[in-house]
Each structure stands twice: as C-alpha cells, then as structure tokens.
A protein has these predicted regions:
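Conserved class I S-adenosyl-L-methionine
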Residues: 1-39
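Class I SAM-dependent methyltransferase "Motif I" SAM/SAH-binding loop
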Residues: 45-49
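Class I SAM-dependent methyltransferase SAM/SAH-binding core
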Residues: 52-94
Length: 253
C-alpha cells in the first residue's frame, strides 16, 4: 500500500458519530478481545486514531500504523495518550514497522479496499500474522461489495455537517468495474439554501479501490496461514449473507 492523501481535505472526525460507533463496535469486539494472549493491540490503518484511543481507555496498549502522514498528524494534534503509539509505515511490511508481538489486531473502516490485487492482500496478511502471537485474532471490516455490485448501489448514505460556514454535505459515489476495482469519489459539497448555485464543490477526488468479495478475502487469509475464521454481516454479530449484509466482518486466527 503506497502513501495516499486523497482524504487530506476531509476531516473524518466530523463525518462520523464516533462515540456511538465505538460503543456499538465494542459490544462486538469485547468478545474476541476478552481473552487475548497479550494486551498489545495493533490498529492497521489507524487513521485519526479514534479506535486506538478507545482501546487504550479499555486498558490495552495500542500501536496504530497508517500510510497517510496527514491522518497521523491529525491523530497526534490533540496529544497522544498513555498506552498509544502512532507510527507511519506500509501495512504490507508491518513487521518492519512495529516491534514485538501483539495479542490482537484490527483492520477496520474499509482500509483493505486500498489493496488492489490478490497477491498484495496475501502479503499484507502474512506480514500481520508474523507479528501476532499464536491464537491472536485479526478482526477485519470492509464494505460488502458483493451486495453493492449485486444491487447496483452507487452511493453511500449522505452525511450532513454543520460547521462555521453553514452546512456541508459529504457525498460518496462508487463506480464498479468488471475487474473488481472500484472508482470511489468522496466529495465535500457546500450547501447554501439561498445560493445560486445552491451547491458548490469544496473538494472531490477519484480514489482507486478494490471491492473485495468474501471468497477472495478467505483465499488470501488461507494462503497467509489464517485457517480459523468467523464471518459476520455487521458488528451486530448477525450472520454474513453475500447479497444482504452491509459489511463483511471477519475474525481470523
């Protein structure tokens, strides 16, 4: 995964109701993280660090790794709490970025969609497995592209943000391609109800992604040595279904 700052002009901390999301996800994560071989957690693609901070509050020692220096700057700008470390580095060779072994790892928020081919995904999983203790879980969450392609869905739900200049709209458009790649277009729009035009583009970029399917994900995990897996359709622990689930959530060991 190469460094990218496609999201440099979008503050994701304002786009997500983080306290509610973290509490909801912890209900799911508390089960696999309840009996880890070590309290050290690895946060792959940590972004602005919300998960890392939350896990540290729960008593874990967390190392967050990301390839975006902009995201890491934002993660550090309010100070780094005890028990948290943020590192810049390539997830494909995370064993060269972090020191020691970990009792568990997470890769959440559709981070793996930035990995563009099967061999590279397998390499990433091998690298992660090399820094995990025996029996340590790797928890993965990506969008369920099987459902998105099957349904023809092109847009994720809109997010409306109030800021000092009024109201903004976060628009995320997807174009699915036959080779499994996705052109993702995150855009931030300024809305002025009395304006002409009423909508103005603040920032908009095309980001190349890969829409990983369940079988592809499992094949890469198998090749990397993760032989035991649990699959869910959301972090509400509902069973995974190819054409119905919003997410693909995997607990791999």
């Amino acid at each position: 995964m190469s460094p990218t700052n496609h999201y440099a002009h979008i503050d994701y901390r304002k786009m997500i109701a983080w306290p509610k999301r973290l509490e909801r996800e912890w209900t799911f994560l508390s089960a696999p993280f309840g009996s880890l071989p070590s309290k050290r957690l690895l946060d792959l693609g940590c972004g602005t660090g919300e998960h890392a901070r939350y896990f540290a509050d729960k008593g874990f020692e967390v190392v967050g790794v990301d390839v975006s220096d902009t995201m890491l700057e934002r993660a550090r700008e309010d100070g780094v709490p005890a028990g948290v470390q943020f590192l810049y580095g390539d997830l494909l060779h995370v064993e060269n970025v972090v020191a020691g072994k970990f009792g568990g790892a997470v890769c959440l928020g559709n981070t793996l969609a930035h990995v563009m081919d099967q061999d590279t995904l397998t390499q990433l999983f091998r690298s992660v497995r090399a820094v995990l203790l025996p029996g340590a879980p790797l928890v993965i969450q990506v969008l369920n592209y099987e459902r998105l392609v099957h349904s023809g869905q092109r847009c994720l739900p809109l997010t409306f943000i109030q800021d000092e200049e009024g109201e903004a709209i976060f628009l995320r458009v997807m174009t699915h391609h036959d080779d499994g790649s996705v052109t993702f277009t995150p855009s931030l729009l300024r809305y002025r109800k009395d304006g002409d035009p009423a909508l103005e583009v603040i920032t908009s970029h095309n980001v190349p992604l890969r829409g990983w399917k369940r079988a592809e994900m499992e094949a890469a995990l198998d090749a990397a040595g993760f032989k035991t897996r649990e699959l869910y359709g959301t972090m509400a622990r509902v069973p995974y279904a190819d054409h119905d689930s919003t997410d693909l959530v995997v607990i791999a060991r």
